[in-house]
Amino acid sequence: MPRRREVPKRDVLPDPKFGSVELTKFMNVLMIDGKKSVAERIVYGALEQIEKKTGKVAIEVFNEAIANAKPIVEVKSRRVGGANYQVPVEVRPSRRLALAMRWVRDAARKRGEKSMDLRLAGELIDASEGRGGALKKREEVHRMAEANKAFSHFRF
């Protein structure tokens, strides 16, 4: 273990439009090459599209989508006696949020709509309604954990 002191967690400021810390974190996940204004434009554009398409409050759809995409368990590799086992472990809350955001972003990037804000809006709507690429990824991770339940006694 390193002997350096523990690095403090940086607090993320809430976004100016909705006052949501999660939304700012999502913008940071979406950001490429430090271009935060581009990420903001995409996210706010997607939220406008969500309100247009669904008629619901956009931030609620966003929060619901992220909540639905959060994994509960995942598998980690553990080496025991020359064999690697996929050991199911519970996911920490901070990692849950990070994984959900990453999966929503990746699923949105893979979609076929014309612009990123339309893709993101579509993915967030799908995730809030219990379908879409991000939820597919979550189910896949849960299936892996379920399949390797027998190795859960090799806890970390």
Curated annotation (Swiss-Prot):
Q: Name one GO biological process term.
A: ribosomal small subunit assembly
Its keywords, alphabetically, are:
Ribonucleoprotein, Ribosomal protein, RNA-binding, rRNA-binding, tRNA-binding
Cellular component GO terms, alphabetical: cytosolic small ribosomal subunit; ribosome
| CDD domains named in the record | uS7_Bacteria (cd14869)
Do you know which Gene3D superfamilies this protein is assigned to? Ribosomal protein S7 domain (1.10.455.10)
Instruction: Give the highest taxon in the source lineage.
Output: Bacteria
Q: Entry's InterPro entries?
A: Ribosomal_uS7, Ribosomal_uS7_bac/org-type, Ribosomal_uS7_CS, Ribosomal_uS7_dom, Ribosomal_uS7_dom_sf
* HAMAP family to which the protein is assigned, alphabetical: Ribosomal_uS7_B
Q: Main role?
A: One of the primary rRNA binding proteins, it binds directly to 16S rRNA where it nucleates assembly of the head domain of the 30S subunit. Is located at the subunit interface close to the decoding center, probably blocks exit of the E-site tRNA.
Annotated NCBIfam families: rpsG_bact
- Assembly notes: Part of the 30S ribosomal subunit. Contacts proteins S9 and S11.
Identification of the protein by name: Small ribosomal subunit protein uS7
Its taxonomic placement starts with:
Bacteria, Pseudomonadati, Pseudomonadota, Betaproteobacteria, Neisseriales
